[in-house]
Amino acid sequence: MNKELESIYQNIANQSELGQTANYDSYYNPKRLYPIPRAPKRQEINLDPNSTTFYGFDCWNHYEVSWLNSKGKPVVAMAVISYDCHSPCIIESKSLKLYFNSLNNSTFPDVETVVQTISKDLSYCIGSEVAVNVYPLSDIPNQTIYAAFDGVCLDKLDIECSVYHVMPDFLSTSSELVEEVLYSDLLKSNCLVTNQPDWGSVQIIYKGKKINHEGLLKYLISFRNHNEFHEQCIERIFADIMRFCQPESLTVYGRYTRRGGLDINPIRSTEPCAFDGQNIRLIRQ
């Protein structure tokens, strides 16, 4: 990371509440939300922030949502939050947790008001429309928990690993043309600011020259001591595969384990992709 980027993210560390002891609000406080611009990290990996050559979204699931109804009785719920990958900013995850905590002792007349409030606040924070669904526990649709992504699991490959900082040079292709769906549960990186571990699974769907599976797995494992936010890691994987393997089409989908009741699930693709049907839940989630 160059010195300019280091300065930007040091300012984030100083101004946000990441890595700091936080005070919890007793009542609704949208000022707890903290945006992080996407552009600096995209410039680092040569991904044009204004490009329309990639698509995708970020999906968050929140399992610890609560507020008071008009009679002061608590309501507990789950929330699904999604927004386009071309939003100017992402939401800093701890700030989102603190924002939701500020709802705990706040009164709302109905679920619709909660949804409207959250959508308005998050949209203002990131400078783009945010879709929000809130499900009281009694209204949550039946949800299948999947043991793994669809596709061929790379993790069964018997490889030696010794590089734990991102090494895209592991990526290579043969001349054989294929369409493949691959996945790994070995994705691990660290928070850019706090160094806390982020655990995830990643699915790679592509068409083009066959990517060497051993090299791809070594590449994914090389994120192990890398410091970046979830969304940035998935974009880096997408950008590196596009650069080093040059597939005709590519989709990279990451699903991370939760922290503070929140899990983050970014998807990036060369093809337009709708959110509907994509928010599957894996066994570690």
UniProtKB/Swiss-Prot annotation:
It is found in: Cytoplasm. Its main location: cytoplasm. Pathway: tRNA modification; tRNA-queuosine biosynthesis. The keyword Oxidoreductase applies. The active site is at C191, D198. The keyword Oxidoreductase applies. NADPH binds at S93, K94, R259, G260. Transmembrane segments: none annotated. Its EC number is 1.7.1.13. InterPro entries: GTP-CH-I_C/QueF, NADPH_dep_7-cyano-7-deazaG_red, QueF, QueF_N, QueF_type2. It catalyses: 7-aminomethyl-7-carbaguanine + 2 NADP(+) = 7-cyano-7-deazaguanine + 2 NADPH + 3 H(+). GO terms for biological process: queuosine biosynthetic process; tRNA modification. One of its GO terms (molecular function) is preQ1 synthase activity. GO terms for cellular component: cytoplasm. Homodimer. PANTHER family: NADPH-DEPENDENT 7-CYANO-7-DEAZAGUANINE REDUCTASE (PTHR34354:SF1). NCBIfam families: QueF. Catalyzes the NADPH-dependent reduction of 7-cyano-7-deazaguanine (preQ0) to 7-aminomethyl-7-deazaguanine (preQ1). This is NADPH-dependent 7-cyano-7-deazaguanine reductase. It comes from Legionella pneumophila (strain Corby). The lineage of its organism: Bacteria, Pseudomonadati, Pseudomonadota, Gammaproteobacteria, Legionellales.
